[in-house]
Amino acid sequence: MSKQESYTPPKIWSQDEDDGNKWASINRPVSGATHEKERAVGKHGLQLYSLATPNGQKVTIMLEELLAAGFQEAEYDAWLVNIGEGEQFSSGFVDVNPNSKIPALVDTTTTPETKLFESGSILVYLAEKFNAFIPNDSKAKTECFNWLFWQVGSAPFLGGGFGHFYSYAPYPMEYPINRFAMETKRQLDVLDKHLAKNAFMAGNEYSIADMAIWPWYGNLVLGNLYDAATFLQVHEYAHVIRWAKQLAERPGVKRGRIVNKTWGDEGQLENRHSASDIDNALASVK
């Protein structure tokens, strides 16, 4: 009988500190800071602490879209949080986000300053602060929130479920991979049927719902996430692919997706303090 078939849960759980998964060294069953370190602060009113994972990309795409739309007050400093090194457990970061997850944002233009965590919360805050990328029509606004929170509730099955067992688990496990592959394909089908009738998630208007969903599901169908496009047969979701490609061509998406990125061939930018930082990073890969 194989290891994955023979496991019997003990009466009381205890942590296996070397369980073989990629992130074992930073996983722990308690919260709070592990070391003292003040957070960096730049010159702009918005201070972002993040990494270019799908959740991190949501916020940098939003900030770059705001700047492209002419909202100069959306200028920001973006500081890399190296989660592999445990930087999310520094005292400065935990002071902003007690949950120790990226992204976290501080708006220093308010008194007292506003501390934000959870990517969906940050998107809503920025949309309301600048009155942008959120529909004014009540019906469309409701649709925007429907899909924004659909993503918040659904993506853990894609990331923590499928992505973990397909890419990061210590060895391939048939049951969880099959279980979460099925759910991921179901979610893609939900999106595909919606986008067959709508240009964007909230109808005809590009919004924070699109910015929340694209980094996960857009990257997935474009082959940028988990190297799983063939396994999941993403070509079956033509409307999701159409939408994903359309958004990928937006300057705000092209710029936002590389901020706090330290891997890959499509541009890297460890920290962002001005528009020229992104310009230079993108120019280096042309």
Residue ranges and their predicted role:
Residues M1-K185, L282-K286:
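GST-like domain detector, emphasizing the conserved glutathione-binding G-site
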Residues S2-E5, P135-N136, N146-P251:
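GST-like fold's C-terminal all-alpha helical module
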Residues D95, E249, I258-V259:
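Phosphate-coordinating loops and pocket residues in cytosolic domains that bind phosphorylated ligands
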Residues K254-R255:
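C-terminal anion-handling pockets and recognition modules
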